[in-house]
Amino acid sequence: MTTNYIFVTGGVVSSLGKGIAAASLAAILEARGLNVTIMKLDPYINVDPGTMSPIQHGEVFVTEDGAETDLDLGHYERFIRTKMSRRNNFTTGRIYSDVLRKERRGDYLGATVQVIPHITNAIKERVLEGGEGHDVVLVEIGGTVGDIESLPFLEAIRQMAVEIGREHTLFMHLTLVPYMAAAGEVKTKPTQHSVKELLSIGIQPDILICRSDRAVPANERAKIALFCNVPEKAVISLKDVDSIYKIPGLLKSQGLDDYICKRFSLNCPEANLSEWEQVIYEEANPAGEVTIGMVGKYIELPDAYKSVIEALKHGGLKNRVTVNIKLIDSQDVETRGVEILKDLDAILIPGGFGYRGVEGKIATARYARENNIPYLGICLGMQVALIEFARNVAGMDNANSTEFVPDCKYPVVALITEWRDEDGNVEVRSEKSDLGGTMRLGAQQCQLNDDSLVRQLYGAPTIVERHRHRYEVNNMLLKQIEAAGLRVAGRSGDDQLVEIIEVPNHPWFVACQFHPEFTSTPRDGHPLFAGFVKAASEHQKRQAK
């Protein structure tokens, strides 16, 4: 089987939406019966985004196999059925790290190690490895053409086009076509300059995606085609839309998938986008709306919680309601009190690291529990709910996590490797287990209790969800908390670790150690988010009586 490659680049400005455009095109090709995957090549020197600030980079998306990756991989999984893995995302830092390791081992036999050919060869090897077994691979190059950081990646894909052959490679370039209000027209010159920049490094784009706040007129597209040496039918207008799920239909209506299939000599049926039409219909025809408060510490950049925000919207689609998300800084809860949480239909506390704002999250969990407000805690959101219950219901004053207070009296949450037994001795778990040292990453099994709410929601006794955390519930202190009324609703496959907790005498109080947002999609939703949004609607109705 021959694999075909579509290399996606961006020009003029960043944040044009390369990831969404690539994912939308992949969705159309998948709807034609093709086996499609998408890769993201990031030019930054960090080995992966795992240690990067969410305020700078946005969320870290965790794949099934435990890779910490760019948030664009979340878009890819929400648009296509193919699951991403560590092969779908790599950085300049990862490439240099691999090459330097080989150089130290002597793999290059004393050669002078250079960007060309050693770095570019390493990039090509990873792209080819990631594309194995697929009909079409879309490869998104991060950054903007002209950035010094992107040059090795652009050189590598130029070489790939020569080596694989132009009959199996396409270059798709996204560019900005701005509207000048003073002139009353769109301007094509930035696009021409961007293509000129690409040509200077040996890449002739085959497809141009023209991003604008309005449809680019046919005469302007013809002008772009003429000056950029691209067929007119391959100049695609991609205007701003109110829903990203309209983009597959927008690209298909301009024949982009037909053009690509002809170029690659692929014989495949017409794309059936009925599932996407259903998503658009559900989004456009809500029967009501709810307001959900999300209490976190990175709220100045909503992309830090991208998958959670999308998953809440998916939960709205499944309940035919619009979800209005109110982002609340947990430090504001500390300084202004829980009064700022009034008038919410439900409360969600997402994952996070570090002590800043934690007491505000603990106060939020207490407010939701005591006032019967639907609550969903994710990762740290589960840990603060447990700490709150231990303090205020189980009589464990000053209970905390060793992440925040290492020598606290009741360490109800502790590092995976540092639980204390009943005699006060530190119990160390095996580092050889799949928990992986200090960070638990990737998809793992969870067994649900038959009498739990989550068992009803999932409709299955065993689930698989993705993790990203260092700290766990301390089993040695669990009996006292359970005796006070907290229910452990789910445990890890080996029955060792607490995965889900519930408050039984509450309309809807669920908190999980894993990240359910990473497996939610617009077409299928997710049981926890669908149930949470439904609970928000029911709470709203109760309050209205």
Curated annotation (Swiss-Prot):
ATP binds at S15, L16, G17, K18, G19, I20, D72, K239, D240, V241. It comes from the Bacteria. GO terms for molecular function: ATP binding; CTP synthase activity; glutaminase activity; identical protein binding; metal ion binding. CTP binds at S14, D147, I148, E149, K187, T188, K189, P190, T191, Q192, K223. PROSITE patterns: GATASE_TYPE_1 (PS51273). L-glutamine binds at G352, L380, G381, M382, Q383, E403, R470. Mg(2+) binds at D72, E140. Keywords: ATP-binding, Glutamine amidotransferase, Ligase, Magnesium, Metal-binding, Nucleotide-binding, Pyrimidine biosynthesis. Pathway: Pyrimidine metabolism; CTP biosynthesis via de novo pathway; CTP from UDP: step 2/2. Transmembrane segments: none annotated. Residues 291-542 form the Glutamine amidotransferase type-1 domain. InterPro entries: Class_I_gatase-like, CTP_synthase, CTP_synthase_N, GATASE, GATase1_CTP_Synthase, P-loop_NTPase. Its EC number is 6.3.4.2. Homotetramer. CTPSs have evolved a hybrid strategy for distinguishing between UTP and CTP. The overlapping regions of the product feedback inhibitory and substrate sites recognize a common feature in both compounds, the triphosphate moiety. To differentiate isosteric substrate and product pyrimidine rings, an additional pocket far from the expected kinase/ligase catalytic site, specifically recognizes the cytosine and ribose portions of the product inhibitor. Belongs to the CTP synthase family. Catalyzes the ATP-dependent amination of UTP to CTP with either L-glutamine or ammonia as the source of nitrogen. Regulates intracellular CTP levels through interactions with the four ribonucleotide triphosphates. This is CTP synthase. It comes from Salmonella arizonae (strain ATCC BAA-731 / CDC346-86 / RSK2980). The gene is pyrG.
